[in-house]
Design a protein with these regions (language model features):
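Catalytic domains of carbohydrate-active enzymes, especially glycoside hydrolases
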Residues: 1-6
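Active-site-adjacent loop and "lid" segments of alpha/beta metabolic enzymes
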Residues: 10-39, 43-47, 53-54, 58-118, ...
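Short acidic capping loops at alpha-helix termini that bridge into adjacent secondary structure
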Residues: 126-128
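Active-site metal-binding loops of divalent metal-dependent hydrolases
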Residues: 135
């Protein structure tokens, strides 16, 4: 199992957390749990990822797919950590404001393919990369259902697929939509 530790909520509408506060939140938790299993550091910030990895985290779980902080790719290359690249349209404050796609499956696939290529070009081995289509992040109920139905498409990228399942509001909306 993987223990994912983060100090900044990335749910839609969440407020930004400064680096100092985020580091103070995650450092003692990573310290206390590093020996309990595989630790993932859930952050968009390169310095928080580096600190977590140096304390024992093995995975950099970045909901921005290395887009938020330009130093993130260097942290991966320098530390040898694994990465989970997630698709999210916009940032937590704006991602649910009228999310639109030409074709959600192909748009998310193309985005993640480009991010994987970016990592490969930086020397990160494909065995260190996983992808997450970002269910609930900048997507409508219809988008989420299309992504779940078409999940097998993402195997074409050549990386393991991870899905975050915490607090998925759309699950409750499915019953209302039927």
């Amino acid at each position: 199992s993987i223990i994912d530790i983060g100090g900044e909520s990335t749910r839609p509408g969440a407020d930004f957390v400064d680096r100092f506060s985020e580091l103070n939140r995650v450092s003692p938790v990573v310290d206390g749990m590093a020996n309990l299993g595989i630790i993932s550091i859930d952050t968009r910030k390169a310095d928080i990822a580096r600190a977590g990895i140096l304390k024992g985290a093995k995975i950099f779980n970045d909901v921005s797919s290395l887009s938020f902080d330009p130093r993130s790719l260097n942290v991966l290359a320098e530390t040898g950590a694994s990465v989970c690249l997630m698709h999210a349209s916009g940032d937590p404050q704006t991602m649910q404001v009228n999310p639109t796609y030409d074709n959600v499956l192909l748009d998310v696939y193309d985005f993640l393919s480009l991010k994987v290529k970016l990592c490969l070009d930086a020397g990160i081995d494909i065995s260190k990369i996983s992808i997450d289509p970002g269910i609930g992040f900048g997507k409508t109920l219809e988008h989420n259902l299309l992504l779940i139905r078409g999940l097998s498409l993402f195997h074409g990228i050549g990386c393991p697929i991870l899905l975050g399942v915490s607090r998925k509001r759309f699950i409750g909306e499915i019953g209302k939509a039927q």
